[in-house]
Amino acid sequence: MKMRTIAKTSLALGLLTTGAITVTTQSVKAEKIQSTKVDKVPTLKAERLAMINITAGANSATTQAANTRQERTPKLEKAPNTNEEKTSASKIEKISQPKQEEQKTLNISATPAPKQEQSQTTTESTTPKTKVTTPPSTNTPQPMQSTKSDTPQSPTIKQAQTDMTPKYEDLRAYYTKPSFEFEKQFGFMLKPWTTVRFMNVIPNRFIYKIALVGKDEKKYKDGPYDNIDVFIVLEDNKYQLKKYSVGGITKTNSKKVNHKVELSITKKDNQGMISRDVSEYMITKEEISLKELDFKLRKQLIEKHNLYGNMGSGTIVIKMKNGGKYTFELHKKLQEHRMADVIDGTNIDNIEVNIK
């Protein structure tokens, strides 16, 4: 019995010792775990502080890089971009610096340094504009000098223009108008609604009205009239008609006519120099109106002999074989009543022109 009790007590003591050992080991383990947890906390805090310091250093490095970039960038950049970069840099610096230093940096960024850059950019931007505008200013006087040098070279042209403008401008304008010739036409009259009667001709489906003045007023009655030729020069709007002519009505040829006459032109200029020209003038009509002769001769004189340039007076004399003559005065337009006069074209002997 004693042995059993001794054995039981020894077993109980062994169990107690093992439990104590396990308790101690568990407590030791718990202390180790707590110590590791405690150790880990400061290490995490240290790592976070290191990261914050790294970010602060990186931010300061970026601000320094931004400042160096701003100093290296050309002065032609706009001031608002620099302000934006500085404000962004100041925002980054807020993480690492205290509030007082942030206010200092903001005040520094608000200082008139960008204004100096703006003034420099404006001065530099205006300088190339002045360089661009200077070449036209240097070139502008050159054409003025050329015009001054050109004007004394043409006094005769100016004299001709001043002479032509008051005296011969209207005559030159009239005798350079286009003329129209129509053969074998049919003429008819309408009821007169003006003081002058008109013969109507329709060549090429267009109506031309011809005023019957002078001898034509009695020669042509109610009509109609067939086989007539007309020489048309459109006149000004005298009778409230857009397109009309005066005179120039003749009979159509009964045979072909090629009658050459001598045309002699004598011209005396303002300096007293006299020039003479002799040529042939072709007559192709049995009956020809004074309107057609006068207009065609003056137009030829304008084109070949500068009539109504600086000279515009003189006469054109149509001499007939029977001793008669018809005179056109160059300083005035042929009268309307004479535009209706008709002569025998084959009876013309010669034509004399005197221009002065």
Swiss-Prot record:
Protein localization: Secreted
Residues covered by region (Sialyl Lewis X-binding): 228-326
Compositionally biased intervals (Polar residues): 142-164
Effect of residue 188 to A: About 100-fold reduction in cytokine production
InterPro entries: Enterotoxin (IPR008992), SSL_OB (IPR015282), Staph/Strept_toxin_CS (IPR006126), Staph_exotoxin (IPR008375), SuperAg_toxin_C (IPR016091), Superantigen_bac (IPR013307), Toxin_b-grasp_Staph/Strep (IPR006123)
GO-annotated cellular components: extracellular region
Outcome of substituting residue 338 to A: About 75% loss of human TLR2 binding
Compositionally biased region (Low complexity): 114-141
PROSITE patterns: STAPH_STREP_TOXIN_2
Keywords from the named record: Secreted, Signal, Virulence
Amino acid composition bias (Basic and acidic residues), ranges on this chain: 69-104
Predominant cellular place of this UniProt entry's protein: secreted
Signal peptide from the UniProt entry: 1-30
Assembly with partners or alone: Interacts with host TLR2 (via its extracellular domain).
The record's note on its domains: The C-terminal domain contains a V-shape binding site for sialyl Lewis X.
NCBIfam families, per database record: PRK13335.1
Protein name as it appears in the record: Staphylococcal superantigen-like 3
Source organism of the structure: Staphylococcus aureus (strain NCTC 8325 / PS 47)
Gene that this polypeptide is encoded by: ssl3
